[in-house]
């Protein structure tokens, strides 16, 4: 639907809070009457947009992880996916989503994060059995570090070190998977 696409584009660029229903309608090429016939308010649209983003990213992650390729190549593809999904994202969007006090939105994020972590840990354990992941890796530590990445996305001092939130996201993802070792040398 044009309204949801327009809303996603606007939210991605300016955040949820700064975008008005009028701006969404203008970008979608619809009247406010059409908007309100379909959606009660901006929050409903924001939740639908986030559900769609989460669903699509889960689907793409699952497709990558089900491929018949070696684990390091799967990780490379996941990193490319992260890069694609973070392209053009604004700091405002990240802040609006992570600092939002709306209960439904928070529950959506908590559930998506939990589900994503469970899938990821499952795949890491499988890779561990195949010898791709250190045998001594403590998975609760890994989960803690994954949660810490979300906290880092709110760190104003850290954010200020990068030209864009997209650059910071990629730095965090690469650091998480590769540490400080050149992944070129790991080949």
Indicate where each model-derived feature is located.
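HTH DNA-binding helix-turn interface
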Residues: 12-16, 29, 36-48
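Hydrophobic alpha-helical connector segments
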Residues: 48, 52, 61-88, 143-146
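Phosphate/oxyanion-binding loops and surfaces in catalytic or ligand/nucleic-acid-binding neighborhoods
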Residues: 56, 67, 78-89, 130, ...
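C-terminal peripheral helix-coil segments that are non-catalytic and often amphipathic
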Residues: 118, 122-130, 147-149, 155, ...
